[in-house]
Amino acid sequence: MTDTVDIPIIAKRLPVYAHPGDAGADLCAAEAVTLEPGERHTVPTGVSIALPEGYAAFVVPRSGLAMKHGLTIVNAPGTVDAGYRGEIRVTVLNTDRSMPYDIAVGDRIAQLIVMPVTRAVFVPVDTLPDSHRGTAGFGSSGYTVTQAGEHA
């Protein structure tokens, strides 16, 4: 069973989950925009929400737009805090080097994921406890997986 939370919303077009079990609800463009190659634009969605305390929403790219058209979101994920009451806007970037991309009113341009969040209490210390990974960062897990499931 999936938990639900009631979220007050002002929108001409409600975000919609495309399939049962989807994590993200589609956000649609409220304004037509043509993105030239390499151009970015902040697109209004016409959606404003009132998240309850203890929740945040995250605006993430749609995989089909990235794969088929080279469209991505510049600050993905975009964070919508519980106290924000303004319109959700999506800064979209056309990464294609030669083709412009037209966004029409009503086009699905991003997804909105609503999640409970935990607020951290940061505790200053002089040293951190050891871990298996330690300070190994970018690329430290390798690029291929062996038959046994180990990273090479």
Swiss-Prot record:
| SUPFAM superfamilies assigned | dUTPase-like
What protein name is recorded for this chain?
Deoxyuridine 5'-triphosphate nucleotidohydrolase
Record-listed E.C. numbers: 3.6.1.23
- Taxonomically, the superkingdom here is Bacteria
Report the protein's function: This enzyme is involved in nucleotide metabolism: it produces dUMP, the immediate precursor of thymidine nucleotides and it decreases the intracellular concentration of dUTP so that uracil cannot be incorporated into DNA.
Q: In what pathway does it function?
A: Pyrimidine metabolism; dUMP biosynthesis; dUMP from dCTP (dUTP route): step 2/2
**Residues at which substrate binds:** 62-64, 75, 79-81
